[in-house]
Structures are given as structure tokens and as C-alpha cells.
A protein has these predicted regions:
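Polar, glycine-rich mid-to-C-terminal structural blocks
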Residues: 404-414
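The feature marks proteins involved in alpha-glucan
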Residues: 1-6, 33, 37-43, 52-54, ...
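Short proline/glycine-enriched turn/loop motifs at strand-loop junctions of beta-rich domains
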Residues: 14-20
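Structural beta-strand segments of beta-rich domains
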Residues: 7-11
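Beta-strand signatures of extracellular beta-sandwich domains
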Residues: 22-24
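Substrate-binding/active-site clefts of carbohydrate-active enzymes
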Residues: 162-167, 171-183, 191-364, 373-374, ...
């Protein structure tokens, strides 16, 4: 992933079987990276392989270019060697690696599995420093999470983020179906949550809000079904209308993960889907729910990915083919989850899971997790999740990790 030192990003990708790895970057001029895809070719920076399988690009600038100017003349070009890679840049990894499913060496261009932020529709990762104070809305920063005295006193309300406000006419149209709908104090939905909190409800369980693979993130690209006015209640017209726009509508429960550690862009307001802008809006939601007296639990789906192999919606398998997914006796990806099963029993797959859970607590201040199909994960993995959270302290991290509530879907298979 990306880390920061002195405001400068460094990059690392674990790809032990790769023959070569190159970082592709586009400078945005915005430390928060809240801009659409930057046009033009990227700057190419070869990564250095370490003995542990990581390919690394540190935060130090390249040696100065001989001329200090772009080939076309004029001011220095930040996409040319000699200029540092800066906070807010957009980036992709180019990985040259042997792919068993195609029996040849492929050159894959992929987003970062550890992405903290993304451009709209997840076309590029964005190097955002989650510690940047400009990403900290006041209510989120200053409102502590409410306490739940013990787990037996917990009352949980499961809620789909978009459904909460998509049809609520008391919410401004531009905020409907978004993170920021929770900040509209006078809306019908927020008033209802406040009343429930007064009655004793203390926890909101949000259906998946990580980066989802199949929801168009541009509002203008989303289609809604048009039900014929004269359709009989028992006709097939309604189903046909829904099926016609199924690939382009905004309705999705969200159980098709693309990036586990970044917020979903379709739930951001229009014009705020890129980079750090969606981070701010997610935090605004958490702050507003805390202010209502409600803890926030995230529904996390680590048991499968949206795709595998060379599929365009496959990230992990294009970086380390055959590692992140659970295979059967002949090498095929298993799908008992109804999708491509992950192999969290593998050390670096487990670490990706653990690290993203810690990120959501430390940098978004969520209060718990519900794990989808938890039985598909080894017990030791869940114990490691618990142990990693328990290490977070108010003094060092601003949160008490021991108070984070964990539970999982209890189906006994996998």
C-alpha cells in the first residue's frame, strides 16, 4: 500500500512471483487527490524487489533531470524523473507475472489491493494520507463514540446505506442515497434513528460500504427501471424492466468486494467520489451517527472477491496469481460462497484482512464488524483480528481497540 513520511508517499506491493513491477503515477496537484482521472500518459517508476517479495518505491525524489524541463520545453513536468511523487497522486501498478490460467507471462495493470482511496469507478488508486487534518470533519473529530455497557445490552439495527434515504423527500435530492444523508438533522430518516436511539437502540449495522465492484459511481451513469404505467400486478413487465437496467442501476446490497479498505464511491455525493473527498463524507456519516448516540458496525466481506483470474474486476489474482484464492484439488478457484473464495489461511491474505479491519477502526473510528460467512475463515484468523484490534489504544491510536465489537454470520459451512 501507500505510507507517508514527512508528507511524502512511499509505495509497496507484495508480488513475490512477479518478474517486474512498475508504478504508474499521475500528479493531481491536490494533496487530497479529490479530482477526476488525470488525462495523459503516466510517469513510470520501476519498483525495487526486496527479499520478502515486496516491490518498493520509497518517498525520496529521483535524482534531478539533466535539463529540469519537459521534452516539450517550459516548466518542469511532475510526471518526469527528477520530480518527487506527491500526496494525492493517482496511481496503478504494472505487474509482469506468469499466470497459470493462461500458461503465459502477462502484463497486468491493476489498482492497489491496499487502496485507501480511489478515483470514480475505481479506475485508479489515490495516494491519500488519512492523517491529513483536511480530511477530518469537525463533528467526526470531536464526537466520541457512545458507550455500550456490555454486549448483552446491544440493540442492533441493520441498515442499507442507499435505501436509508434514496426515496426520502425530506432529504435534499443531491444527498439522497449518500453518506451525507445522515447529516441532515431534520430528515424523516434521521429523526426516526434519533427516536430509536432514545428508545434504547444503540448500534447501526451498515450493509457493505467498502468499495463495491458493480455499482456505477457516476450518478449520471446510473439507470432506474421504468415500470409501465399500465402493468398488471401479476405481469412480468416489472421483472423485465428491472432486468433491463440491472447492470447499470444503483441498487446493490454490496456483497461483491473490489477493495476492502476504501469507502464505496457511489454513496458519495456527485463530484465527491474521487480520492479523499469520499473519505471525508464517510467520516461525516460516522460522526453524525455517533452524535445520535449510535455506534457504527460495518458489514465486511472477506470470504470472497467479486472476480478472480484475469477478469477486469480481479485485483488480487492479477498481482499474485493463484495465491489469494482457495483452490480445489485440480487448481480451480472454489466458490462455496457463490463467488471466488478467498484463502485467508494464507499469511498475506490474512494480513490484508487484518490490516483493513484495523484501518477502519483507527482511521474511521467505527465501533465493530459483522463478518459475512465467518465460517469460511479459520478460527485462528479471527483470533488474529481480535488481537490486532486489542493493540489499539486511546493514547497511541485515538481508539480503544478492546471495545470493538465483533460478530459473524453463523452458517456452519465452508
Amino acid at each position: 500500500g501507500v505510507t507517508f513520511s514527512g508528507g511524502r508517499p512511499s509505495f509497496a506491493l507484495w508480488a513475490p512471483t512477479a518478474q517486474a513491477v512498475t508504478l504508474l503515477t499521475w500528479e493531481t496537484g491536490d494533496p487530497l487527490g479529490s479530482v477526476p482521472d488525470v488525462p495523459g500518459p503516466p510517469r513510470r517508476t520501476p519498483a525495487v524487489r526486496h527479499d520478502d517479495g515486496r516491490w518498493v518505491i520509497d518517498s525520496r525524489p529521483d535524482p534531478p533531470a539533466a535539463t529540469g524541463a519537459s521534452e516539450a520545453g517550459g516548466a518542469p513536468d511532475q510526471n518526469q524523473p527528477g520530480s518527487p511523487i506527491t500526496a494525492g497522486c493517482q496511481y496503478l501498478w504494472e505487474v509482469r507475472v506468469y499466470v497459470p490460467s493462461t500458461l503465459q507471462v502477462e502484463t497486468n495493470i491493476v489498482t492497489d489491493p491496499y487502496s485507501v482511496a480511489l478515483t470514480t469507478d475505481s479506475t485508479r488508486s489515490v495516494a491519500v494520507d488519512l492523517a491529513d487534518p483536511h480530511l477530518s470533519p469537525e463533528q467526526w473529530a470531536e464526537t466520541p463514540a457512545p458507550a455500550v455497557r456490555n454486549d448483552s445490552a446491544r440493540s442492533i439495527y441493520e441498515l442499507h446505506l442507499r435505501d436509508f434515504s434514496a426515496a426520502d423527500e425530506t432529504v435534499p435530492p443531491e444527498l439522497r442515497g449518500t453518506y451525507r444523508a445522515f447529516t441532515v438533522a431534520g430528515s424523516a430518516g434521521v429523526r426516526h434513528l434519533a427516536e430509536l436511539a432514545q428508545a434504547g437502540m444503540n448500534t447501526i449495522h451498515l450493509l457493505p460500504t467498502f468499495d463495491i465492484a458493480t455499482i456505477p459511481e457516476h450518478r449520471g451513469s446510473q439507470r432506474s427501471p421504468r415500470i409501465p404505467a399500465g402493468a398488471h400486478p401479476a405481469s412480468a413487465d416489472q421483472q423485465a424492466a428491472v432486468a433491463e437496467v440491472a447492470d447499470d442501476d444503483a441498487y446493490n446490497w454490496g456483497y461483491d468486494p473490489l477493495h476492502w479498505g476504501a469507502p464505496e464511491g457511489s454513496y458519495a455525493t456527485e463530484g465527491h467520489q474521487d480520492g479523499g473527498a469520499r473519505v471525508v463524507e464517510f467520516r461525516e456519516m460516522v460522526g453524525a451517527l455517533h452524535d445520535l448516540g449510535l455506534q457504527v458496525v460495518l458489514d465486511q466481506v472477506y470470504n470472497h472477491t467479486a472476480a478472480c483470474g484475469q477478469d477486469p474486476r480481479s485485483v488480487l489474482d492479477q498481482v499474485v496469481p493463484g495465491y489469494y484464492h482457495r483452490l480445489d484439488a485440480v487448481g480451480r478457484v472454489t466458490s462455496s460462497t457463490c463467488c471466488a473464495n478467498t484463502a485467508t489461511e494464507h499469511a498475506l491474505c490474512e494480513r490484508l484482512m487484518v490490516d483493513s479491519v484495523v484501518r477502519w477502526v483507527r482511521w474511521y473510528r467505527v465501533d465493530g464488524f459483522r463478518f459475512d460467512l465467518m465460517g469460511h475463515h479459520p478460527r485462528t484468523v479471527m483470533e488474529h483480528v481480535r488481537a490486532a484490534l486489542d493493540e489499539l489504544t486511546m493514547e497511541a491510536d485515538g481508539v480503544d481497540g478492546r471495545s470493538v465489537y465483533l460478530y459473524g454470520e453463523g452458517w456452519n459451512f465452508g
